[in-house]
A protein has these predicted regions:
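Acidic, amphipathic alpha-helical patches
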Residues: 34, 52-55, 132
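Short gly/ser/thr-rich secondary-structure transition/capping motifs
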Residues: 24-30, 45-47, 121-129
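Rossmann-like dinucleotide/phosphate-binding beta-alpha-beta segment
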Residues: 130-163
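Phosphate/diphosphate ligand-binding glycine-rich loop within oxidoreductases
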Residues: 43-120
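Residues at the C-terminal ends
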Residues: 39, 80-82, 159
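N-terminal glycine-/charge-rich "phosphate-binding" loop or analogous flexible N-terminal tail
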Residues: 1-41, 161
Length: 163
């Protein structure tokens, strides 16, 4: 089976899949060679690439589109269904993906609030005079959606006494 990772930043994932699935051909493709690679692939792992009717029609051997995360919004689900190509994702619950994404969101909340880039420059110059930015502690936070990620983020924010 030929599995196409549609970006070149997935090299560590490709290497791990090659180890785990030695009987399969795990490949990546340069953007200008993507059409040819899709035509030869049995499985697409699109990551950030949109999968439209054009890509689906190129993939005459496609048996599965496996999204590299929870969202499948970049995949033309109607066209895939019409062509009999199943689309799968990584559910946030069983894989702990929600926890990882929530942790990343919290990192960005703290970093943005504390103006991390500016703080990092000041620390490098040893010129920190006063606390930078705003604290997440006791902040009022609005979480849009309480699915796997939103729920995990809410649990993390409890430790910061957030509203």
């Amino acid at each position: 089976m030929r599995i196409l990772l549609m970006t070149d930043w997935m090299t560590p994932i490709r290497d791990a899949l090659n180890t785990a699935l030695p009987d399969h051909d795990i490949v990546t493709a340069e953007p200008e060679k993507l059409s040819d690679a899709i035509a030869q692939a049995n499985v697409l792992i699109p990551a950030r690439n949109p999968i439209t009717t054009v890509e689906l029609q190129q993939g005459t051997n496609l048996q599965l589109i496996q999204q590299f995360g929870a969202g499948v919004d970049a995949v033309d689900l109607e066209s895939a269904a019409a062509m009999g190509i199943p689309v799968a994702n990584v559910p946030s619950g069983p894989s702990d993906l929600a926890k990882a994404v929530a942790e990343f969101a919290l990192f960005h909340m703290i970093g943005a609030g504390r103006r991390f880039a500016t703080l990092q420059q000041a620390l490098a110059k040893q010129s920190v005079q006063t606390p930078f930015g705003a604290s997440v502690f006791e902040a009022r936070v609005c979480i849009i959606g309480v699915g796997g990620v939103g729920s995990a983020l809410a649990r993390l924010l409890q430790a910061f006494d957030c509203d």
